[in-house]
Amino acid sequence: MFEKRPLTKDEDINWLGIRWQPTMRCNFNCFFCLQHQYKHHSDAIEKQILNDSLDKIDRAFASGKLKWWKIIGGEFTILPLSIRDRILEIAKKYDPYLYLTTNGSNLKNWLGPFTENDVHGELLISLHDTETDIFKTIEEGQKFASSHPNFYVRYAIVAKDNLDTVIKAHDILGELLIVQACREEYTNKITDEYKASPEYKWIVEHNWGNSYNNKYYSNLRTDDFECTMRGIVIDYNGRIRLCNRSKDEDFTIEEALNELPRSVTCSRQECTKCNGQIFKNIYTEINAFERLMNMKKRK
């Protein structure tokens, strides 16, 4: 339910990620969330858990420890109205920069919670290249953007099966975040197609929670390549930096890993059994990427 990034000395860039799951089950154990203390998930307990967690978040904003608020995963709009109203109340009171995500089918639910200027932030709309109503979703997103000028609206698409749809969506929007374009032949098609369109900004991002594929790195050929993994960003030149630090500040692999909140572990079955294997996997992936970049430099 909640994911807390490590706090930094610079209060202006402190932020809290809130991960809502449709089942209200928690993916992370952190001090903002009490859900891991309960084994049952009755409606009453879940509501109390949410209220207790929001009390902690309220106090954190009041103390100045947090400035940004990111709601990710699941659907904010399926929460009980009293909880949703409480979140909006906190957001309006402390005016943090609010990051929101939604899938296309639930986009219409976002038109209600916010008035034109009451909060500001960013809305990421997730699409899939096999959706039948993908262009209707894009149209609804553009309506939201025009009626909510304080929100920057972006789009992300799972690009796996229908290249023509991806290209058409990109032509409409001019900017599109590509997520999980992992099939080798498909990734090559995307990068080859848009080598001729340098005016478009393409970012290829691979979510840290999914399975990694070393071939994925070696087949991406775009100048704007970034890979985000649990607070670590590796840019196309092989430079390692942290999401919650200045882009101009470089880190070694060891320094970056030391900055990760090691006590925050994924509760999915394949992760809890491995006793921290998720962090070892991240280390392996960074190593593989570093070796790849060294090979490119030698060439």
Annotate each language-model stretch with its function.
Residues 21-24, 29-36, 74, 126-129, ...:
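Short loop/turn segments at strand-loop or loop-helix junctions that form parts
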Residues 1-16, 36, 239-299:
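Flexible mid-to-C-terminal extensions adjoining Fe-S/redox cofactors in radical SAM and related proteins
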Residues 53-72, 79-180:
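Radical SAM/AdoMet-radical enzyme domain recognition
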Residues 164-250, 297:
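A C-terminal junction/extension of Radical SAM enzymes
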Residues 6-52, 244:
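Canonical Radical SAM [4Fe-4S] cluster-binding loop centered on the CxxxCxxC motif
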